[in-house]
Design a protein with these regions (language model features):
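Loop-helix junctions at membrane interfaces
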Residues: 1-178
Length: 178
């Protein structure tokens, strides 16, 4: 049985709350979630601040919790997002903590892996629903429509993660950004 330290449990709780509040603010302001990707930020932060299991769980739990709170992401899309966000949390944590990549390369690698999972998930979902699967529109949604969210992630996540991690380490132990 794995026991979470108080710090990790507190961080996971704050990130879960942030993962509910940010999408709610987007929806209230009329900004589509697929443009700013508000659930992604807490999951990526979790990848750098929590263990791989906790950050994976955070990514898997956020979409259905948000669906229950706000109805978004819509059913059955949240199933695909559970896989995508789970991989974001798991991959960013493994790249950063196990492979010792810097924050930005870990974030970028996790973004690519998560989007690959999303593409696979949507192809399976469309096959189950008997819909035509248009790869180009999905790629446009994952990479073009969401460019503002990707830009926000590439700026905000490394800065916030480095700031939080820096406060825990000695002066000589600053986390690598690159």
């Amino acid at each position: 049985m794995v026991l979470l330290r108080t710090r990790d449990l507190t961080r996971a709780s704050v990130l879960l709350a942030l993962g509910i509040v940010l999408p709610s603010l987007c929806h209230l302001s009329g900004i589509p979630g697929q443009v700013f990707l508000p659930m992604h930020i807490p999951v990526f932060l979790g990848g750098f601040l929590l263990g791989s299991g906790e950050s994976f769980l955070l990514g898997v739990v956020l979409p259905p919790v948000n669906f229950l709170v706000s109805g978004m992401p819509p059913f059955p899309n949240f199933f695909v997002m559970m896989g995508e966000l789970g991989v974001y949390g798991l991959a960013s944590s493994l790249f950063f903590r196990r492979l010792r990549w810097g924050i930005v390369p870990s974030l970028f690698g996790a973004m690519l892996l998560g989007r690959a999972v999303a593409i696979s998930g949507y192809s399976v979902l469309f096959a189950i629903l008997g819909r035509d699967f248009n790869v180009l529109s999905l790629l446009q949604s994952l990479f073009v429509v969401s460019l503002p969210g990707i830009a926000i992630q590439l700026v905000a996540v490394p800065g916030l993660a480095a700031l939080i991690l820096r406060r825990e380490r000695d002066v000589a132990g600053y986390p690598r950004l690159l």
